[in-house]
Each structure stands twice: as C-alpha cells, then as structure tokens.
C-alpha cells in the first residue's frame, strides 16, 4: 500500500539520548492505526487518494445520517476523525477496510506534521508579531503600543498587510522536515525530533517530508605523516 501519510494524535514530549550522550527533544505521536474508509480514483474524482479514519470509535448516535451511511457503505465502524491522503501509485489496489499502520515509516527519514496550533486569544503586537516596544526608561509613556502604522498625506491610508494586535493561534500549521527518531510498532508510536503544533491530545496528520534532508557527509580523517 503506497499511502503517503497517516493520521494520529499528539501525546506529548519527552527526550531520548543519542549515542554520544546528548539529549534529543522528541514529540511522541500515536500514528494510527487507521482504516481506509473511501477510495478516490482519477476517473471519478480527478485524483488518486484514500480517506482514512483514525481508529477511535464513536457512538453511532453521535454522528449524523450522512456519515452513518458513509461508514455503512465502507463496511467499517463509525470513527471520530477522518482525513484524506494522496496515493503515490495510481495503480494501488487499496480498498475500504484496509488498515494503515506506522510500519510504513522508517527510522531516520523525515516527515511533515500538520495540526492546529494552540489558541492564545487576543494578543498585542509585542507577543503576536515580536514588536520591540518602546523605551522602558523613566518618563516613557510608550511601552507595548503598536506605534506608527502609516505615512503622512501619501498614501493617506494604512498599507495592506500591516501587523496589528488580534487573535493569535488556533491556525493550521505544519512543522516540516522532522526526523523520525524511534518507532514502536506494538503501541503504534512515532517519535520525531522537535516540536509539533497543537496541545497534547490534538489530532495531527503525518506525511513524508517534501524536502528530504541528506545525511551529513563526514570527510575522512587525513593520515598523519609518520615520525622519522
């Protein structure tokens, strides 16, 4: 099955130790198991993909009739979280009911993780856009205010794209090129280096990184000349 990604849940952060003893910050992700709910084909839908459902079952009375019929047609139990993943091979014979597991990833490869970031509410320019702020000295009455937002008689308006205070967070973000540090196939766990958007317990989408990093090339050590 040439599925390019998998659905999961962010469990939290931990650290593992490399061979040289350095601590590596990692995010623990529950990657699957997922079940194929629908198969999209190029002839019918214009592209090749599968709709996955994260195996986190929900009571039938908690979903509407449209989703009830959707799951019934696929022959799978109702699930809480659905997501669509493109197929690498158009000739892939994936069908509804097939399972997608974390075994599709390998230690050392890089992945992109997408999720909804933590909501911060209404925030000012200093926190939201990293404004420097005014002077903190005695007599200053300008500390965390936005400051000037435009020019004089020209253009007599505020330029588009100015950074202002406003709602911060609660947006779909993607952490790119995170290295897979460890895989636990028995518990469907995936450990990636670095941080991932969203709080613990948030739904995420894991896909192979579009930009795979190359392994660092270590130059061979030069042989020292023999002492005479």
Labelled PLM ranges:
Residues 1-228:
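Extended basic (Lys/Arg/His-rich) segments that typically form rRNA-contacting surfaces
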């Amino acid at each position: 099955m040439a599925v390019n990604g998998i659905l999961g849940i962010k469990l939290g952060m931990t650290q593992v130790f490399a061979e040289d003893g350095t601590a590596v910050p990692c995010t623990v992700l529950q990657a699957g198991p997922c079940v194929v709910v629908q198969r999209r084909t190029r002839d019918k839908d214009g592209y090749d993909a599968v709709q996955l459902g994260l195996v986190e079952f929900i009571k039938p009375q908690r979903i509407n009739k449209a989703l009830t019929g959707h799951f019934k047609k696929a022959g799978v139990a109702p699930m809480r979280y659905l997501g669509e993943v493109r197929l690498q091979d158009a000739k892939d014979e994936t069908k509804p009911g097939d399972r997608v597991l974390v075994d599709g990833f390998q230690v050392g490869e890089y992945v992109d993780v997408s999720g909804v970031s933590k909501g911060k509410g209404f925030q000012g320019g200093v926190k939201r856009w990293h404004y420097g702020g005014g002077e903190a000295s005695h007599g200053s009455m300008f500390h965390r205010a936005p400051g000037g937002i435009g020019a004089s008689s020209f253009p007599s308006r505020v330029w588009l794209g100015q950074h202002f205070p406003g709602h911060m967070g609660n947006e779909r973000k993607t952490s790119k090129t995170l290295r897979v540090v460890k895989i636990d196939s028995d518990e469907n766990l995936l450990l990636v280096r670095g941080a991932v958007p969203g709080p613990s317990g948030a739904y995420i989408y894991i896909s192979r990184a579009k930009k795979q990093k190359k392994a660092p090339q270590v130059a061979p050590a030069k042989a020292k000349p023999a002492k005479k």
